[in-house]
Regions:
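Alpha-helix initiation/capping motif
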Residues: 13, 31, 71, 81, ...
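A short glycine-rich, hydrophobically flanked beta-strand micro-motif that places a catalytic Asp/Glu
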Residues: 54
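Helical subdomain adjoining the active site within ATP-dependent kinase catalytic cores
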Residues: 6-10, 72-94, 106
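Active-site activation/catalytic loop segments of kinase-like enzymes and analogous catalytic loops
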Residues: 4, 11-51, 60-77
């Protein structure tokens, strides 16, 4: 199979790059009509060999499995963020000094991790409103809001779930091609 010499998929078969583009640009949503339209458009510029066309279903499977792997890695990162939030919540509840609580919150970089922020804030709002207010004040210093970060965390979950669902449907579709 012809191999790419440049780009992010250099050294890989050209048909894998096509499959990865199809999978990535459509959030894992691939059906027969998409494949045919994409292939027709691609071949109007650069013809593919018969071997490449025959290998397309396998390469689509590989690209979709890679996309699903990335979603699983994101899910593990979210799980780690939730575990960090639980640990921090327990630590914050044990400590009563405001300065030490602030230091713990500062180390967490809540504004950079919406899942961690959402989880920790939710736990603190339930158990210690003072810490929840402290978290909100720290976020405001960074020009961020708890509502905005919680919305971002929810959007990330929805998109990840949708992408995983798309990949599974696409794998089934390709299996039937």
């Amino acid at each position: 199979l012809p191999v790419l010499l440049h780009g992010s998929h250099a050294g890989l078969p050209r048909i894998y790059d096509i499959a990865a583009c199809m999978a990535g640009r459509r959030d894992g949503r691939i059906d027969e009509a998409t494949v045919y339209a994409f292939m027709e458009a691609y071949q109007s510029v650069t013809p593919l060999t018969m071997a490449e066309v025959a290998e397309l279903p396998n390469m689509l499977n590989a690209a979709l499995v890679k996309l699903l792997t990335l979603e699983c890695e994101r899910a593990l990162e979210a799980e780690n963020s939730m575990e960090t939030a639980k640990s921090a919540a327990a630590q914050l509840e044990r400590i009563k000094e405001r300065a030490r609580r602030e230091a713990i919150i500062d180390r967490l970089s809540l504004g950079e991790d919406p899942v961690l922020c959402e989880c920790l804030y939710g736990m603190m709002k339930e158990h210690d409103e003072g810490i929840a207010e402290l978290i909100n004040a720290k976020l405001q210093l960074e020009d961020k809001s708890i509502d905005g970060l919680c919305a971002k965390a929810a959007a990330m979950r929805r998109r990840s779930t949708q992408r995983a669902d798309n990949v599974i449907r696409s794998l089934r579709c390709i299996g039937g091609m």
